[in-house]
Amino acid sequence: MNDIWWQTEGQGNCHLVLLHGWGLNAEVWNCIREELSAHFTLHLVDLPGFGRSQGFGAMSLEQMAKHVLKQAPDKAVWLGWSLGGLVASQVALTHPERVQALVTVASSPCFSAREAWPGIKPDILAGFQQQLSEDFQRTVERFLALQTLGTETARQDARTLKSAVLALPMPEVAVLNGGLEILKTADLREPLKSLTMPFLRLYGYLDGLVPRKVVPMLDAAWPESESQVFAKAAHAPFISHPGEFCQALMALKQKI
């Protein structure tokens, strides 16, 4: 079994595993690495098939979580952004003893719109899958542009995301397709009710992929969890609002 790319840095007494989103890699954390590594031992990860973790095909959510867990510290705070939030949540469900706290960023337990549940229309996700086979570079760029729409620094934020993608080899089409399949089909709304560890959910008010309407719905469904919405952020609050984002993590660290 191949190992995935994994880098550890920082000297905090609390371990923090950072999982990126679809189409990306650990370079997305560059804007907050320095700040966080003063307070946490950071674990920067390229998910299987993404960035420097080459040699993997498409995976299910369960397989992806299993791979990441294999190289993880015994106990850590797990933070996942977007698709990474589903992977971190899956780890918390299968190995709660390894998860000191769970943090999901601009993530949803069910990305796809369902009956009485706001999300991405399934035909949009299917459209992305279709376009991937035709022009996957352009499809990834369109998806990145969607993530920063509406913020005051949208252009700059989109450039930051794009440079993270271009810094490393592009994932295989099958891997990208597999990631979209997870976003299209995963539904962890019920299972996550059972979590007992501290659980912090961070959102961007302007997010076009995870509608803000899900926040009060999940506040009600998971009363033990906490939520925070960054008023002027979209899908990548750690890029548009790095200071406030790091403060939220420091506040969580004080509680665990």
From Swiss-Prot:
Residues 15-242 form the AB hydrolase-1 domain. Substrate binds at residues 22, 82-83, 143-147, 235. GO terms for cellular component: cytoplasm. Signal peptide: none annotated. Its EC number is 3.1.1.85. Pfam families: Abhydrolase_1. GO terms for molecular function: pimelyl-[acyl-carrier protein] methyl ester esterase activity. Its main location: cytoplasm. NCBIfam families: bioH (TIGR01738), PRK10349.1 (NF007674). Monomer. The physiological role of BioH is to remove the methyl group introduced by BioC when the pimeloyl moiety is complete. It allows to synthesize pimeloyl-ACP via the fatty acid synthetic pathway through the hydrolysis of the ester bonds of pimeloyl-ACP esters. This is Pimeloyl-[acyl-carrier protein] methyl ester esterase. It comes from Citrobacter koseri (strain ATCC BAA-895 / CDC 4225-83 / SGSC4696). The gene is bioH.
